[in-house]
Amino acid sequence: MLYAILGTSRMEEAMVKAIVGANCGDEGKGKITDMLAEESDIVVRFQGGSNAGHTIINDYGKFALHLLPSGVFYNHITSVIGNGVALNIPYLVKELKSLTDRNVPMPKILVSDRAQIMMPYHIDFDTYEEARLAGKSFGSTKSGIAPFYSDKYAKIGFQVSELFGDENTLKEKIANVCTLKNVMLEHLYHQPLLNEEDIFNTLMEYKEMVKPYVCDTSAYLHQALKEGKKILLEGQLGSLKDPDHGIYPMVTSSSTLAPYGAIGAGIPAASITDVVTVVKAYSSAVGAGAFVSEIFGDEADELRRRGGDGGEFGATTGRPRRVGWFDCVATRYGVECQGATQVVMTALDCLSYLEEIPVCVGYEIDGKVIKDFPVTHILKDCKPVLKTLKGWHCDIRGIQNFEDLPQEAKDYVAF
């Protein structure tokens, strides 16, 4: 995948960098994260869960990481799962095993004692709710993310630290959770009820699984900052999936913005000195929601087939991604939301087959053209205003320097 770094910044000197997406995710962050991880001492996942994947291609093969930080392929890196992550403990263990089964050395992993635990019933509730909503569903990956974060903010989630506390206190909390959940299961979803003993036993199993990795990761990271370590904060999805600033309600349930990296990792906000924001040379999305520059039919199938690392299909769901032309309005907004100090464009080579390349430069709504990204109820009625750029129509894979690109490709990046 070809990429270009745009703009200037303090990339080499930065102590803490955040790498995030400007759009709906799938921007190619994994490739850039892998590149930056090699220069880092610590890589931190700070939000989300196993609901989205980062594709990494290296000497060990091709991997789609869903929960583990991208630093797991480097022996010198400590990989941290921060307090902001939706921690699916069996999935963590499974993903670690999938690495070692393919001859990747066992990575150094730390898990925050303040992280909250994804429970099996979160995944069940996600599935039940999508079924209940039917044609009006949000296109969930059914990874339990929305029910998990609902419980976290309703203060009925289970923190990792609680596994190592008083068991009677834990059992009292389980009883309260079951009382609340079983009302919904019985009267709304008409599904089997939760059993207190089963939940306690599950949590005790999780305790043994995660015990080797648990620590106060915030204290660890604060000490690392004092020692001048290089820390990389690895974001999931992108600006347009943020619950506050994205295409609500077709969003995820945790903040996808770089400033949240400090909260989800447990470090001072001022310590983030670089925000590397990734965009793709065209647009893509998984699931429902407004998508102004979307294309359809044979045109979409061709771009989908040529896109990404082996086609535009979700790393978690395998669903074909919706695709469209580069959207200047949405991308500018996404970059601004992230507070980008650098912008990286990926997948430029995927457009090499086109003689002409449309770009969305504005939105038309009620006979007017707007350049600012609107709220959802306006966005869904917008039509793309397209400008056609000349394609380079040659293979640019393998080109290492921006100056060596065909002029048309350079013009596209600079547009």
Regions found by a protein language model. Give the residues of each.
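Non-transmembrane, aqueous-exposed alpha-helical and coiled segments at domain scale
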Residues: 2-415
